[in-house]
Amino acid sequence: MRTVDDRRERLARLIDLARVYRGWTRTEIAKALDRDAGKLLPDSGNPKLDLVVGLADALDWTIGDVAEDLGTEAVVVSPEMDLRSLDREAVQCHRSGNWRGMIRTARQMMALASTAEQRAVACNRAAGGFDGLGLFSRSLPHLQAGLAEPGLPEGLRLMLTVNLANAHYAMWHLVESRAASREVIDTLSDRQVEDRRTQVCRAFAHYVRGSSTRRLAMLDPERGALHASAARPDLQESMVSYEDLADTYADDRYAAMANTCRGAMIEVEVRMGHMGAREAIDRLVVAVERVVDVEHHPPGDWLESWGWWCIFGCNVILHHLPQEELPRPMAIFSNKANEIAERLDNWSLRERAFSMELARRDLTGDDPWILDMEDIRSLVGTMGRFPTFRDRGYRILKSARLLIPEGGPRCAGA
C-alpha cells in the first residue's frame, strides 16, 4: 500500500503535469482546481472526487485514467526475482484462479522487463488476471499495449490478438472481436500448424469469431439466418480442433471447449431452420440435467460449458418459442445458468443469466424479483463490468423487492 508521502508525490506530479500542459501558473492551476494555491495537496494525499475531476479536465484525461494513475499500487521487486520464475508464478496463479496474484506478478514482470517480448508477455499475464476477474475493460489496454511492442515472435502476437478478440467478445464489441479473430485465422489459413500454442490460438480464434457472429444474429434478427450460417463453420472448425487437442494432449479443458461449440451449434442450427426449436430444447435440457447438484459438481471448464448450454437454451426459447410456452423451460435454463455462474464466480455467465431472466420476466409479467444481499452484490458487480448491461441492471434494481437487513445500505428499489 502507498504511504502518505507516496500518494502526495504522485498527486503533485499530476498537478505539475497539468500545469505544464496548460501553460498555467500555480495560481491558475489552483483556480482551475478550486483550491487554495498554498494548499493544493491534501495532507492525506487522498484527493476528493472534485479534485480528480478537475485534474481530468485539466489534463484532457478520463476520470478513470487519473484515478488509476493515483491508485496504482507501488510495485515491489526484490533482488532475487527474475522474469522466468515470475512467469512460472503467473502461470500457477492462473491455474489456481488466483487472479489478483497473477496481476501483481505481471506488474513485477513489467518492472523487470527490458525487451519488447518481455513487456508483451507481462502484458498478456496482466490481461489474463483481469480476464479472470471479469474486468475485460481493464484487460483490453494491456493486450493493446502488448501488441504495440515491435518485433514480437509470431506465436506471442497471435496469442495477444486472440485474447484481445475474446475480451472484445465478452464486452459485446462484436465488430472488434470478429476483426481480431479473423486476423488470427487469416494468418494461419495457408499453413500446417504443429506447435501446441498456435493450434490453440487457431481453435480459439474460430470459437470467438463463430460466437461473435452467433451473437450478431440476435442483434440483427432480420439477417439472423445469414449470420447463423456464417457462424456455424467457425464453430464446427473450433469444435473439431479442440477435440483433436484434447486427444493429442490428454487435456480435458479442450474437450470442454469442444462441448461449448457443440451447444452453440444447436442454437445456430435452429436459427438457420435446420432444427426445430422444441427438438433443440429437448436436447439441451437432457444435456444440462447432467449437472444435478451444482454446489457439489466439480468446478472448472466442464461446468462452465454446461452453463453456456443453459444460455444457448435461453436464446432458443426467447427467439423461437411462442410466449405461452416460455415460462417453464426458460426458468430451468436461467436458474441453472445463475447457479453455475455463482459456483464459478463467472461474470460473463452472470451477465447472460441476469439478462435472460429479465427478458423472461418482461415477456411473462411474473412477480418482481426478490434479491438478497448476495444477489445485489452480484448484480452491481455485473453492472460495473459490462457497460451495455448497466441499464438492465438499474431496471432490475428498480423493480425488485430487496431483502436488506435492518440498518443495511439502501438503494433504488428498496
Model-derived features with residue positions:
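A short, Lys/Arg-rich alpha-helix, primarily the initiator
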Residues: 1-22
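TPR-adjacent "capping" and linker segments in tetratricopeptide-repeat scaffold/adaptor proteins
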Residues: 2-6, 68-85, 113-114
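Short alpha-helical DNA-recognition segment
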Residues: 20-42
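DNA major-groove recognition helix of helix-turn-helix/homeodomain DNA-binding modules
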Residues: 49-66
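Flexible helix-coil transition and linker loops at the boundaries of alpha-helical arrays
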Residues: 73-77, 107-119, 146-157, 186-203, ...
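Structural signature of alpha-solenoid helical repeat junctions
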Residues: 81, 118, 154-156, 194-201, ...
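Tandem amphipathic alpha-helical repeat scaffolds
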Residues: 83-96, 118-134, 156-174, 201-224, ...
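Helix-turn-helix repeat elements of alpha-solenoid scaffolds
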Residues: 91-108, 128-145, 171-192, 223-245, ...
